[in-house]
Amino acid sequence: MENVLATIIDEKHNQVRALAGTTSFATLDQAAKAASPVRGFAAALARDSAKGYGLIAELKKASPSKGLIRADFDPASLAKAYEGGGASCLSVLTDRKWFQGAPEFLVKAREAVNLPVLRKDFMIDPLQIVESRALGADCILLIMAALDDALAAELESVAFDYGMDVLIECHDSAELTRAAKLRSPLMGINNRNLKTMDISLDVGAAMLPDLPKDRIAIAESGLFTPADLARMAAAGARCFLIGESLMRADNVAAATKTILANPVAS
């Protein structure tokens, strides 16, 4: 069986080399330092999850497993719909090849709203982190399955140097143990196996209770109904990253309100 994550990471190395060949660290650093001030991503989730659910609403046009998810994909209008529906933060896919995303999608989405924005991509090099801040990202994603401990710590440190938050993503107990050594309070449990793209909510149900209590637990992938959120909440999550189910909705704002309604008491 093809290891989807490994294939994507191989391509990311090519993309990083191309980026390094077309722009310098100094140029990106200057742009990052001149970018719009960082919006507190972790703070927004902590605030909203204290009184209900915290939602990272994702702008995702397509995926390797599902193909095209939303044809009428306008980042600005979708971002506004999410904000109107009560999302705490946004996540924007910027990978072109596998998710039909684009860095400019993040720029357009962030300019349209006041919400903090996560750059959802496969981070393997400090240059990508600086580029993310230059684009306006408030948070970056670190996928433990794609990184060794030293690189994960380095990328986290660079993100912190630029004032960004960091979402650390795990899929199994070994990755969770490694992630707990990092400093970020944001820890996501992905119900999707990125090597096979298979999804099971059993992953979150089993792993969420093991997260360090001083971290903000975020359940990711396979969340389609309030009952799905309730199951993850029972395991310890008050925050959720949801993309596909909301992207497929005719009325994105209404779907966002529905998924957030009647949160299970903590």
Predicted feature residues:
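Structural recognition of alpha->loop->beta junctions
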Residues: A76-S88, K181-N193, G236
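C-terminal helical cap(s) of enzyme catalytic domains, especially alpha/beta-barrels
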Residues: A206-D210, A233, R248-S266
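Catalytic cores of alpha/beta
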Residues: I124-L135, H171-L182, A219, L223-I242, ...
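Catalytic-face loop-and-helix region of soluble metabolic enzyme cores
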Residues: L186-I242
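An N-cap/entry alpha-helix motif that binds or orients negatively charged groups
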Residues: E2-R70
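Active-site beta-loop-alpha junctions enriched in small/polar residues
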Residues: E11, E58-A62, D95, F122, ...
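N-terminal active-site wall of soluble small-molecule enzyme domains
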Residues: Y53-G54, L59, S65-L167, S173-R178, ...
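Glycine-rich phosphate-binding active-site loops on the catalytic face of alpha/beta enzymes
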Residues: E131-L151, I189-T196, A235-T256
